[in-house]
Structure formats: C-alpha cells, structure tokens
Amino acid sequence: MKKFICETKNLSKKYKDFYALKNVNLTIPKGEIYGLVGENGAGKTTLIRLLTGLNFKSEGEIILFGHTDNLQYERAKIGCTIEMPALYKDMTASQNLEVQRIQRGIPNKECIADTLELIGLSNAGKKRVANFSLGMKQRLALGVALLGEPEFLILDEPVNGLDPTGIIELRELLKKLVKEREVTILISSHILSELHQLATCYGFLHKGELLKQISAEELNEECKRHICLRTDNIQKTTLLLEQKGNINNYSVYPDNSIRIFECLDNVRMISKLLSSNGVIIDEISVQGENLETYFENLIGGRKNV
C-alpha cells in the first residue's frame, strides 16, 4: 500500500467570487518526484503556499505525513523555495545559511559546509550574494530549503535562471536526494520538457482545478507514438489485426479506440486489411505527443469553461 507524504481533499482557495483553487484532490506518494504542471495563473503557487502554511485555505483538508492536526509541526519537515526567496544580499552564501540555521534552531554547524558542497557553492568564498548570478542565487535558495534535511521538498520554478549545465546538475542533485535520502519532492515548472526528464508522477492544474494525476510510466505510454484506430467493430478489428495482420502489440482503451504500437509505417496496409474485410474505419492516424502537446490537448476542452 502506498504511503502518501501529502494529500489534499477538496482543497479550495477563494478570493471574493474568484476561486484560485477549486476542489483540488492531490496525492503525493513517498519517494516520488511530483511534477506540478500548469500555465501561469493556473494556481500552482497558490497551492504551494497553502501546503506550506503561507496562506489560509477557504475550504477542504490538507494532510501532511498522514496527519490533519498540528500541521505546524508537520511543516517543520518541509523545505521549500517559493518564487525567489529572500536572501541577504550583503552576506556570503555561507553567512546566509548560517543565519537560517540559527533561526531554525539547527544545532549541527557542519551542515553549512555539507550543504554548500551539495549545491555547488563551496567555492563561492567571500563573494556577496549581491554579486551572484541568478543561477547561483537559485542554488543558494535550494540550499536554504535543504537545511535540516527535510523529508519533503517543495520547489517552485527552481530552474529559472539556470544555464543548461546548471539544469542538468540540479536534475542529478534532486534524483540523488530521492535515492540517498528518500526525500519526496514537489516541483512546479513551466519548462515542461525538463519536468519530463525528472518527474516520476504528474498533476495537471488548469484554472485552479486539478484535471488529472498520472504516473510517468502511464504518461509515457499515452505519449508513445502509435496508430490510433477507431472502427465500428472492435472485436472483429482485433481478430483481423492478430490473425491476418500478425499485429499483437496493441491496446484497447475505454473510449473504444485501439492503439497500435507497431507497423507505424504501414497504416495503408492496416486500412486495406480492415476495409477489405468489411470493417468501417472511423479514424486511423499516427499519433504521439511530448509533454507540452499532451498538456495542450488535456486543457483544450477546458479553455472556454
């Protein structure tokens, strides 16, 4: 049975007559990297602020580490970066972390050097944050979130300002945290191609509503290139595919479509096979999506809602 680090039940945030979030039912399993996908204004940051206690919910329930009571205590196990966190510009990276360590009552002074090494700022020396690049500031913000070895890490747009090398380093660091420290991560980003290389499960937000949750394996299966086939007789179609077309790598979906994952260059052969045996074809086309296209198609029917 899966253990959930974070859950919400019908969570809503309302401003007068406007719902920034509406009836969000979120589940984040332990040890996963949960990619939160959504357009600007979809409610990603609002959701994160509710989870971390920086804003109050209007309705619904938040469950952290299996508990609904004393959430302030449970939130002590969370490290987070929301938008661009406040850093002391006249201080060094080490001094910034030391201030945060003292404020949080973390006794282990050695965690400063360990954290600087982890985020790649151990050589920053006496350089003040005011002179940091945006990427260096992002890494320092991540270091602040990692102080105290949190069990649940929440990152809002963490790759902003990072160059390609920095993005790769961050990706490997987050994977390392999951593998070696068993940290669970919620990460929101508008760079969907990067999420696709990192997340193990996804939630899709649109206009404050959570449209869908899906595992990376399920998403990859749905995005995989295939022949989408719809006919007037599924049973007869599958028999013909197997017995006369020698096609066995296919799946039948609840919407009565058939996805064929082989013979992608032989659409004409499949069409001829079915038509010549009295099957009426309603649709036959080669399809396949990346994460951006998948999300666009997912929200396509909701844009005018």
Q: Residue locations for each model-derived region?
A:
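ABC-family P-loop ATPase nucleotide-binding domain
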Residues: 1-12, 301-305
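ABC transporter nucleotide-binding domains
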Residues: 3-6, 13-187, 192-206, 210-212
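Short, flexible turn/loop "capping" segments at secondary-structure junctions
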Residues: 53, 219-222, 250-252
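Short loop/helix-cap segments at secondary-structure boundaries that form the rim of catalytic
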Residues: 73, 220-221, 241
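Phosphate/oxyanion-binding loops and surfaces in catalytic or ligand/nucleic-acid-binding neighborhoods
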Residues: 103, 298-302
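Conserved beta-strand-loop-alpha-helix hinge in the C-terminal portion
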Residues: 209-232
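Short, charged/small-residue-rich alpha-helical element at the C-terminal edge
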Residues: 225-298
